[in-house]
Amino acid sequence: MDKKTVRKYRIIIFLLILIIIGGSYAWLRTVIYGKKDVQITVGDFDLVLSEPSDGINLVNSLPVYDEEGKTNTPYQFSLENRSDIDLYYTLSLVDDEEAIAGCDTSSGSSCELLDPRDVRYEITMGDRTFTGSLSDSSIIDYGVIESRETVKGELKVWLNINTGNEAMGKVFLGRLKVFATQQVDDFNFEQGNDNVNKPEMDSNMIAVKHDGYNWVKTDIDNGWYNYDMGIWANAITVKADKLSEYQAAPIGTEINMDDIETMWVWIPRYSYTIAGDGTTYYGKRGAYLNSEPTAALPGEIDVKFVGNDVKERGTAKYSDTDEPSNWYTPDAFTFGDTELSGIWIGKFETSSSNPSADYGGGNTTELDALIKPNVTSWRYINVSNIYQVGLKISASGNRYGFSTNMNSHAMRNDEWGAVAYLSQSRYGKLGNVNFTGTDKEIYQNKSDNFITGCSYGSPSNGNTDYGCQYQYDNNIRTEDGVTGKGVGASTTGTIYGVYDMSGGAWDYVMGNYNDMAASSGFSEPLTLDSKYYNKYTNSDASLACNGRECLSYSLSETSGWYNDYHNMVSETYPWLLRGGRYYSSTGAGVFGFNSASELGGPGSNCSFRLVMSPSL
């Protein structure tokens, strides 16, 4: 099959109407009406959705924890592929505009809509079960239905335990929508979420998900993450005097943001390759870009998740007329002599234990690192002190409770690259179907107060209306035609990604030219263990790794993507910065890099990020 001429059809099937009504006598009233044996035939497609006549009828229900909600009677349906071709589909629960338009209250006024954050669900399709909130994404399931296959599904819904009194009298009206295409190699789910290496956590770390209102403790074995849906695994650490309390708490317990000290995102080990025409390599158009890839609007980076026994060393390039090949496993997943199953990335730019201090911390190692949203990032600190602050997190007697099972450190440049490449894959914002065109680029943080997690609500640009236009959790539900203004600043376009990788402050990374210390505070030449920094031997990014291209470092491979800065380190400016700052124009972005005019010394616009490498 010619992948360039694959036919795609948008199929909307009114198989489910979901009504949730809050009232003084009934917190939750849910009735799901299905249309029995709905069949849609378009060209080679022949899909049949079958469902029993009885639906769910929940009356006089109260907001409940997930454990209780999962005991509700399921609504059952099936999806049958009667055609001779395999189909890839995504199943979304979206607003039923027709039902909303016809909805009136007993007084005759239009119905007020219930916030999607108030609706929790569990969906089972075949042998897959996933629990989530309608605020996570409108997509509730995805997959491949093989030719002549029937997949049975079950859906349970309940009211979020955190629903407040303001929900009284409001309604939610929804319908299921199916998007389907002929199955091609672009949708190889054998390389998807099932192959993700399970996050390696220390005993002090708590797995979390966002319920639409707050971060809550989650079950590590049931729906914690789903990389196919842009839900990357998140974990936190809390204050020492709160740890035992949260460890003993039930699944679904809200984590008070004041108790959180660090937040982390798991980047699983993967291999990648980049498509091109033999001269330029801007990624592939694939299923997620509506134009041919260019430097200004690059395409998809092919990614496949691999075990830590796999270390591929191909060219990381292939012709876009062929199947993906020449895979390369990023150097970020090697720490010294250890091959890692993944790495934990600080979710936000680093802040300090005294964010009200000058520059959010200043040039000292006396403060401790925090990683959380809505605080001032730690700036005006030289690279030597950044290095020491990174080591402190997992050092003996640290305040966070980390053991020797973890190795904390300042982010290397290749580790930045690992996050950037995953964001440009189908598992990151590039693959998030709620964003199209130029909105595929990670939104810029234009906060002139350097507040972590902020979003301008659009990619980097020359606008000078600085500030924190949207906080990181703004509009966490994205619907057709409406982009998530806050979550668009994350690497996934969901709340589960990494923030502050475009704008905010420049981020120092441990990338250096020929061991030159300059103003960093290190002695010269550098005597650091090589596992803590990347050494570059040439100011030409295509020759910087001992005369060769630095594959996986997001340097020459992705130079100028999204028109981001691309200035390499040199003898004059030996230390590397990433991401851009709040007042950078179009040059700010996840692929942006620059040689630091501060020479590794303190800068009022320079912050840093932290990484945790498991050594279990």
Feature locations, PLM:
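Surface-exposed interaction patch
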Residues: 19-20, 29, 67-128
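C-terminal, structured domain-capping segment
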Residues: 71-88, 92-98, 139-184
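Extracellular structured ligand-interaction cores
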Residues: 74-76, 171-175, 205, 259-269, ...
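N-terminal module-boundary/linker segments of secreted carbohydrate-active enzymes
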Residues: 185-325
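C-terminal, surface-exposed recognition/capping segments
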Residues: 414-417, 438, 444, 448-466, ...
